[in-house]
């Protein structure tokens, strides 16, 4: 009789949804890695380092503060997704669709976004050092206060983009479309501009900062 009551209780718990956490976790893993489709999934703070997520559908998903270092997201659909504060260092995002995605404060240094779709995406205050954005579409994107030093933006579309106070030191902008882009306050030091010429006029700011930091360290 006791065994009967125990198993009846277990069945009741299962039907009441107590085990939904385990079931839902298995579900998103199946959708993400097997079906390659996890639209509007909540993956906030998930550890997906070095995950093979090429061509996966993740549109409108939540990936805030997710660990995606060195993940393969080539050709992935991340349109409208939220990746605020996400770690994407060294990730492969070649040809990925990030249209309208929110990447504010994300860490993308060393990531490959060649030919990626980033129209009207929010990349403000993100770390984009040494990022490959060759031929990427950044039309209307918000790149305010980003660190784009040593990045490759050759042939990229930056029409109407916000680059206010962006650090473009040693960046490559050869052949890029910067029409109607806001570059006020941007650092252009050893920067290759669309014409192919090297711009040095903004070097005074990083030099002053370097001098200031040196003095602080010497104290």
Predicted regions and their residues:
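Bacterial N-terminal signal peptides
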Residues: 7-17
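Tandem repeat scaffolds
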Residues: 24-219
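Positively charged n-region of N-terminal signal peptides that target proteins for export
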Residues: 1-7
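Sec/Tat signal peptide C-region and signal peptidase I cleavage site
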Residues: 18-23
